[in-house]
Amino acid sequence: MNRRQMLQRSVGTALSVAMAGTGLKAGATKATPMPGSAKELPKTVSGIALPDTKLAIAAYELGAGAYSPYLLNHAMRTYVFGALAGRAQKKEFDEETLYIACVLHDLGLTQKYEGDLPFEIQGAEAARKFLIEHGVSREKAEMVWDGIAMHVSIIGSYKRPEISLVGAGAGADVVGPDPAEVPAAKVAEVLNAFPRLKFKEQFLKTCADVVTRHPRAAGRTFMRDIAERYVKDYHPRNFCDAMEKAPYEE
């Protein structure tokens, strides 16, 4: 496994590197207008078809109603990059399931769905509730939950493709995809369809704001790195303190 692949396996590590200045420098492209509804989405991006089932459309509308424009575009790029990685790795996956998990993977960073749990859990809970309300099977709902909850952990990369490719796609959008899997021309097509809209700056601010309001939202992921750098008086809990205070003599 090369260094870039390892970074993509953990979005937490990936974002830490991104903050240090690592990132894909794509050539300038003329951006297409951002879609206002699912009906305005392109049919395909970089050879990847965007699912247009009723459930996929409903998931997109849920995300579009909660995300800021830059975060919605990130969610869409996550799906395309994840699907491209899956195709390059010859993995079989259910497109609709992966799409929904990718589109909703950052709900926990929105004012509508943020809370005191780690942001990835907040988002996973919201997505599962949405799916159950739409009559989706418990198995599929749990798969989406896992994809969202594990997208910031290397554990997710060892799960089935509908789960692992969420983190792969998100990681690719943070530090850039493996060129062997996603050539520069395809990256340009993705950025043209879904512009970054000052993603680095906006994402860091959003994460810092969420942790300011909900300190536990940082968990032990890249969110803690952001909190330690950008959130005043942030003092995360330490495992050693809990162990030392345990009710045992030794």
Where does each model-flagged region fall?
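Divalent metal-dependent phosphate-bond-processing catalytic cores, especially two-metal-ion Mg2+/Mn2+ enzymes
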Residues: 11-12, 35-36, 41-43, 66-72, ...
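An active-site-proximal "capping" alpha-helix that borders the catalytic cofactor pocket
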Residues: 118-133
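C-terminal segment of N-terminal export signals and the immediately downstream linker at the start
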Residues: 1, 21-51
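Alpha-helix boundary/capping segments in eukaryotic regulatory proteins
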Residues: 88-96, 112-119, 138
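N-terminal secretory signal peptides and thylakoid transit peptides that target proteins
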Residues: 1-14
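Acidic/histidine metal-binding catalytic segments
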Residues: 74, 94-97, 135-147
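A short glycine/serine-rich beta->alpha loop
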Residues: 63-69, 109-115, 211
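His-Asp-centered metal-binding catalytic motifs of divalent-metal-dependent phosphohydrolases/nucleases
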Residues: 96-113, 123, 147-152
